[in-house]
From Swiss-Prot:
<keyword id="KW-0963">Cytoplasm</keyword>
<keyword id="KW-0808">Transferase</keyword>
<dbReference type="GO" id="GO:0004683">
    <property type="term" value="F:calcium/calmodulin-dependent protein kinase activity"/>
</dbReference>
<dbReference type="Pfam" id="PF00069">
    <property type="entry name" value="Pkinase"/>
</dbReference>
<keyword id="KW-0723">Serine/threonine-protein kinase</keyword>
<comment type="similarity">
    <text>Belongs to the protein kinase superfamily. CAMK Ser/Thr protein kinase family. CaMK subfamily.</text>
</comment>
<feature type="region of interest" description="Disordered">
    <location>
        <begin position="326"/>
        <end position="388"/>
    </location>
</feature>
<feature type="region of interest" description="Calmodulin-binding">
    <location>
        <begin position="297"/>
        <end position="318"/>
    </location>
</feature>
<dbReference type="InterPro" id="IPR011009">
    <property type="entry name" value="Kinase-like_dom_sf"/>
</dbReference>
<keyword id="KW-0112">Calmodulin-binding</keyword>
<keyword id="KW-0547">Nucleotide-binding</keyword>
<keyword id="KW-0333">Golgi apparatus</keyword>
<dbReference type="GO" id="GO:0012505">
    <property type="term" value="C:endomembrane system"/>
</dbReference>
<dbReference type="InterPro" id="IPR008271">
    <property type="entry name" value="Ser/Thr_kinase_AS"/>
</dbReference>
<protein>
    <recommendedName>
        <fullName>Calcium/calmodulin-dependent protein kinase type 1G</fullName>
        <ecNumber>2.7.11.17</ecNumber>
    </recommendedName>
</protein>
<dbReference type="InterPro" id="IPR017441">
    <property type="entry name" value="Protein_kinase_ATP_BS"/>
</dbReference>
<keyword id="KW-0472">Membrane</keyword>
Length: 477
């Protein structure tokens, strides 16, 4: 079970005047506005860790860090990144994290070449096991999403690790009320600003499972406000042809997790007993071609959203694992300062931004129709009304936005504006186009041709054009 240390994180901090006396700084793994993450080697033991160096600043909320520490120091599970130690100096906090070098979930799927339902089932089984452990210890993650699922090592049989506990919460009487998370993965009760429980994590696992089997999210709309309305309605589809080769057992599993009523939604314990997880109903048919294409299209890499969270210390994948003991990696970086504060990124809105490349289809070839196959557990809602959404800025203040548009989902093609497939209207019998929520896709894989910004279609003056957009939202009650 979890560690039994005192709740006051100050009792856990070790004071230091020079962190380099304890660790050898080897190379940078990543950086954010207030922190940098280094590959370090402990001088006494020779062990390798990821060291997150957080610069003390009036703009950085100590309460957020202490919440993260309070959660991380309580837990110890084979599928959860471990907080090993904490140091503090007059200028920095230092979080010593377990080194995770296997890369992100999506990256590994793209590298496989062959991918089946059974592969997805094994991933979700590990996630359910870890989240079940969190829930048993009174902890709700609240921000489960694919980019928070990393592989421990580059080996093919590596374990999945859950990271990023910045939004985690220790339950008080089993109920919480602060609305937070990532659009597209947030449960309906959170968006409805109702009190919620650990069931929100199970909803997120349902969304992740859906994505792993088709490459795009279950909820996508033209605007954030419409996206939120669709999530609150709890309505989604298993569209053809993307779901034609997926088993009914997998769809049933998803339906039980994407249950609108949190009281009827599967718990982690129930989900672990489902035949798709615990039985032999997950198919071994290769779904790589379709899923990989949709993942590359809908989850483009976005450098301006690459802010490191407490446990997300991976950027060196296979290169790091293969060279850990080579002379070039053992070379110290003694002259590098612990932190070089990066300027806060702003929302890109240049019309000249680069876009995700897409092949041009033969205009004489008709586009495949997307047949609507409603989930048997859902009823079709009326068209969602428009609305405004609250976008949380870096300093915590709120602004109103109604123009942000997620990426569009559908077969790759060139849009009517000539820029990208995101502008393409794909549907059947006048139905609106299908959109997906663009998500951070960190990857050092040179094989993939991802651009630095997520491109979204924006209607202006009767025409559609592309520009960069941000969808990360935290709703604060």
């Amino acid at each position: 079970m979890g560690r039994k240390e005192e709740e006051d994180c100050s009792s856990w901090k070790k004071q230091t005047t020079n962190i380099r006396k304890t660790f050898i700084f080897m190379e940078v793994l990543g950086s954010g506005a207030f922190s940098e993450v280094f590959l370090v080697k402990q001088r006494v033991t020779g062990k390798l860790f990821a060291l997150k160096c957080i610069k003390k600043s009036p703009a950085f909320r100590d309460s957020s860090l202490e919440n993260e520490i309070a959660v991380l120091k309580r837990i110890k599970h084979e599928n959860i990144v471990t907080l090993e130690d904490i140091y503090e100096s007059t200028t920095h906090y230092y979080l010593v994290m377990q080194l995770v070098s296997g890369g992100e979930l999506f990256d590994r799927i793209l590298e496989r070449g062959v991918y089946t339902e059974k592969d997805a089932s094994l991933v979700i089984q590990q996630v359910l096991s870890a989240v079940k452990y969190l829930h048993e210890n009174g902890i709700v993650h609240r921000d489960l999403k694919p980019e928070n699922l990393l592989y421990l090592t580059p080996e093919e049989n590596s374990k999945i690790m859950i990271t990023d506990f910045g939004l985690s919460k220790m339950e008080q009487n089993g109920v919480m009320s602060t609305a937070c998370g990532t659009p597209g993965y947030v449960a309906p009760e959170v968006l409805a600003q109702k009190p919620y429980s650990k069931a929100v994590d199970c909803w997120s696992i349902g969304v992740i499972t859906y994505i792993l089997l088709c490459g795009y999210p279950p909820f996508y709309e033209e605007t954030e406000s419409k996206l939120f309305e669709k999530i609150k309605e709890g309505y989604y589809e298993f569209e053809s042809p993307f779901w034609d080769d997926i088993s009914e057992s997998a769809k049933d599993f998803i339906c039980h997790l994407l249950e609108k009523d949190p009281n009827e939604r599967y718990t982690c314990e129930k989900a672990l007993r489902h035949p798709w997880i615990d039985g032999n109903t997950a198919l071994h048919r290769d779904i790589y071609p379709s899923v990989s294409l949709q993942i590359q299209k809908n989850f483009a890499k976005s450098k301006w959203r690459q802010a490191f969270n407490a446990a997300a210390v991976v950027h060196h994948m296979r290169k790091l694992h293969m060279n850990l003991h080579s002379p070039s990696v053992r070379q110290e970086v003694e002259n590098r300062p612990p932190v070089s504060p990066a300027p806060e990124v702003s929302r890109p809105d240049s019309h000249d931004s680069s876009i995700t490349e897409a092949p041009i289809l033969d205009p004489s070839t008709p586009l495949p129709a997307l047949t609507r196959l409603p989930c048997s557990h859902s009823s079709r809602p009326s068209a969602p009304s428009g609305g405004r959404s609250l976008n949380c800025l870096v300093n915590g203040s709120l602004r109103i936005s109604s123009s942000l548009v997620p990426m569009q989902q559908g077969p790759l093609a060139t849009g009517p504006c000539g820029c990208c497939s995101s502008c393409l209207n794909i549907g059947n019998k006048g139905k609106s186009s299908y959109c997906s929520e663009p998500t951070l896709f960190r990857k050092a894989n040179k094989k993939q041709n991802f651009k630095s910004e997520v491109m979204v279609p924006v209607k202006a003056g009767g025409s559609t054009h592309c520009r960069g957009g941000q969808t990360g939202v935290c709703l604060v009650m």
